[in-house]
Regions:
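RNA-binding basic/glycine-rich loop and surface signature characteristic of RAMP-family CRISPR effectors
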Residues: 1-306
Length: 306
């Protein structure tokens, strides 16, 4: 079934003694002024991994093959062929139809350029950069010792010493938007053969947005969890575009982590007639969401999912 309403909100990721998104030097990504952030790709990676584990068709993901005794990475054409069969360069529309059968392409869009086939799809779901909202974050560097000798050391007698960089605690806040109307052109093109962005696809995105990071299992991301999420559901037919909601979020820590959205009071008041409801997800053992300054009319729209 086609999704007919827009959604705006935030996804909160907590990193504790972990490195949620490293740069090429292995350090947590940061802006020139030192603000730590995570790219949209890091969150999309987690979501795609969960979809893969659930048996969904995922196109834009790194996969590997063994060729002539070597472990290699598949190119885009090979990944497409694995999912949909050989590309028919004489049937450009068939390729486009297949792209929308992959959950990640349907959700996030894709740039597909293989042989004579070129498609650029703007996804219904857009995720922004996720900035750390916690002011007391420290970056920690640890020396780590490999159990193996350093092949470059004289006499090969020295063990390899490396480093592991992580944050003691950070709270990343990703703004996102869901706009099903971006596929109106393709719906007109394909007619009844294409529903556009569906409720089923949205629910799969929503489930992954709430759980995918917690499910990651690696040395760097083992301390990263889904901390909270807020979904502002507009009414069906509303064409309003809300500003990035992450700019209205602050994070502090007392006995619990306090996620404060009171700065959004004027914004939510201005759009209240366009809003169907506001869903807030969090673990109340660890987190508290403060919206005490919002008007009673806005509070009535809030549904807490603890």
């Amino acid at each position: 079934m086609e999704k007919k309403n827009r959604v705006f909100g935030v996804i909160g990721i907590k990193a504790e003694m972990a490195n949620w998104n490293a740069d090429f030097n292995g350090d947590p990504k940061n802006t020139p002024d030192g603000t730590i952030f995570g790219s949209d790709k890091s969150l999309k990676y987690a979501i795609k991994q969960q979809w893969l584990e659930n048996g969904e068709k995922v196109l834009m993901v790194k996969t590997k093959k063994i060729e002539k005794g070597n472990l290699l990475v598949n190119n885009l054409e090979e990944r497409y062929t694995k999912l949909f069969g050989k590309i028919d360069t004489k049937n450009n529309i068939e390729v486009l139809e297949n792209l929308f059968k992959a959950i990640d392409t349907l959700t996030f869009g894709a740039a597909f350029a293989v042989k004579k086939t070129n498609h650029s799809i703007t996804g219904a779901v857009q995720i922004n950069q996720g900035f750390n909202k916690y002011e007391d974050t420290n970056i920690i560097t640890q020396d780590i010792l490999s159990p193996f000798a350093n092949s470059n050391a004289e006499g090969n007698a020295q063990a390899t010493i490396g480093k592991m960089v992580h944050v003691d605690e950070a709270h990343y806040c990703y703004g996102f938007s869901v706009n099903p109307t971006v596929y109106a052109e393709y719906k007109a093109l394909f007619g009844e053969n294409f529903e556009g962005y569906t409720e089923e696809a949205y629910e799969k995105f929503k489930e992954a947005a709430l759980t995918a990071v917690t499910g990651l299992n690696s040395a760097a991301k083992g301390g990263c969890i889904n901390e909270y999420a807020i979904f502002i559901n507009l009414k069906e037919g509303s064409r309003k575009m809300l500003p990035k909601f992450d700019t209205f979020v602050t994070v502090e820590k007392e006995d619990k982590v306090i996620v404060n959205i009171n700065k959004a009071k004027n914004l939510l008041e201005a759009y209240k007639n366009e809003i169907e409801n506001i869903e807030i997800y969090y673990d109340d053992e660890l987190t508290e969401v403060d919206y005490s300054a919002l008007t009673e009319e806005i509070k009535e729209l809030i549904k807490e999912k603890i």
